């Protein structure tokens, strides 16, 4: 099976120049009268954000509960949700022969206790990526659909919205979405720790065999 190389938006790296400067991250059309029409074109027929993943976010997510920076510590302390970081990175399936697959362009600092599942917030996921995502959700929730899950990324990250929506559609009933992500967590005084992405190599290998 031939795999296409998936390239993460440079805007998704906290240290990329585009993020620091804000270059290329604003809505391409500042005209309010055309905003609604253009925004509709950013979604696929299943309602997932399909491109321009770094953009202003809505106030809600289908099937999930929104958590703000001033609430997240209480949510973590009270409900102990599985913390899932979905920040995207470059994926090169052909590199698995060298024991690697994810190629982060800089260290990722996220909320302590988090599991990093890169790219699961994209709209159109390959079958092996869907399995990677769903298997980890089962593991992190002990197979219980009512166990809490909290998704985040960085500020203005539609991938965390997509991941929350997909988990809710799979039947998870306690989905939390933290739209401010690590930016909001750090700004509120939260500690960040360096984390490695979960390996996807076995999923790619299984897909190649099939």
Please give the residue ranges for each predicted region.
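Short hydrophobic beta-strand that contains or immediately precedes a catalytic carboxylate
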Residues: 72, 80-87, 114
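Early exported N-terminus immediately downstream of N-terminal targeting peptides
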Residues: 77, 86-94
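Bacterial N-terminal signal peptides
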Residues: 1-9
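Rhodanese-like catalytic fold shared by cysteine-dependent sulfurtransferases
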Residues: 9-69, 75, 95-150, 154-210
């Amino acid at each position: 099976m031939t795999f296409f190389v998936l390239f993460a938006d440079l805007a998704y790296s906290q240290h990329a120049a585009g993020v620091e400067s804000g270059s290329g991250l604003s809505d391409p059309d500042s005209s309010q009268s055309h905003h609604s029409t253009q925004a509709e074109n950013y979604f696929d027929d299943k309602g997932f954000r399909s491109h321009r993943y770094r953009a202003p976010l809505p106030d809600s997510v289908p099937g999930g509960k929104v958590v703000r920076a001033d609430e997240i510590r209480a949510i973590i302390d009270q409900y102990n949700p599985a913390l899932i970081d979905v920040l995207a990175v470059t994926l090169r399936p052909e590199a698995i022969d060298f024991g690697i697959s994810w190629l982060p362009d800089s260290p990722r600092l996220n909320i302590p206790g988090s599991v990093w599942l890169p790219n699961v917030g994209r709209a159109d996921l390959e079958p092996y990526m869907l399995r990677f995502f769903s298997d980890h959700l089962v593991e992190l929730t002990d197979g219980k659909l009512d166990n809490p899950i909290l998704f985040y990324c960085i500020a203005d990250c539609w991938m965390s919205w997509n991941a929350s929506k997909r988990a809710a559609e799979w039947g998870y009933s306690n989905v939390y979405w933290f739209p401010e992500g690590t930016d909001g967590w750090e700004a509120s005084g939260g500690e960040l720790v360096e984390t490695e992405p979960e390996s996807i190599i076995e999923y790619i290998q299984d897909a190649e065999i099939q």
